Amino acid sequence: MKQRLSGKRRAYATTMKILMGIAAGMAAALVLFLIIYVLSKGLPNLSWQLLSTAPSYLSGTIGIWPDILNTLYIVLATILIVVSLGVGAAIYLTEYAAGSRIVAVIEYAAETLSGIPSIIYGLVGMLFFCEFFGMQTSLIAGALTLVIMNLPTVMRTTQESLKTVPQSYREGAFGLGAGKWRVIRTVVLPGCVDGVITGCILSVGRILGESAALLFTAGFGHVLNDFFTAITKPGATLTVALYFYAKEDGEFGVAFAIASILMAMTLLLNIAAGVVTKRFGREKNNE
């Protein structure tokens, strides 16, 4: 009887192992196919002229240089604001307001906001920033909308990173006479900086891939604006440009070229996040 049960368990374990292996292989094959397909369609259409010039309807040339700059402007503006607010809020909730009822309320609200479709953020951003505050359609309106979208993610990842720092580290620093802020600045933050940086890098990836919210707030102009005034002007990011080249102009080659650039950026960000995590993890183990 025992041998029969043992044989059934081995057969069941083997079957499940094979099924899980097939599922993993299919997932990997799908991702690999997607990467190869996009690159095979996009790389032949990449050129220095495409990357370094602005589009001109008079001469019939196509260029995405303004879209690249607009993407960089929005990423920089968004990440500067969202990191300041998100990390600051996480520090307050974890270190100063720990255990209070407001923490649970804010955490629940943050998790709820994370599940809202981005197009709703775009609609709210258009009504709030573009209309109510009179920013009109501009990169800064798009950046502020993306701040609201990514704030819950940065805040929650920072909170979880702060919680990984052992309480004994804080108590030891307090025992040496250090104040609350000094403990946070010199003990807590250095102990979880890898998680904070990783969360910020992954947020950059989400910002790069956003399009629906920016259609409502940042606009879709392909104009090369002045550096100091670009943030107050409308402009298309790479994702918005991809949509318009594919949907409106029928330029699928250019759309795939932009998709290749975005895919490469996302891959580099994921690699950077992995490198940061491994490096700081190695330093912690050495300590």
Name each model-derived stretch.
Residues P117, L176-G177, P190:
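Glycine/proline-centered hinge or cleavage motifs at structural transition points of membrane proteins
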Residues L93, Q159, K163, I201, ...:
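C-terminal transmembrane helix and the adjacent membrane-cytosol boundary/short C-terminal tail
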Residues M1-A24, A273-E287:
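Transmembrane alpha-helical segments of polytopic membrane transport and secretion proteins
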Residues E111-M149:
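Generic hydrophobic transmembrane alpha-helix motif, especially the helices
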Residues T78-A110, L123, A273-R282:
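Transmembrane-helix boundary motif in ABC transporter permease subunits
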Residues Q3-L19, I36-T78, G99, F244-G253:
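Periplasmic/extracellular loop-to-transmembrane helix junction in inner-membrane transport proteins
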Residues T158, K180-A218:
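Transmembrane alpha-helices
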Residues P55-I62, L214-M263:
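Interhelical loop and adjacent transmembrane-helix boundary motif
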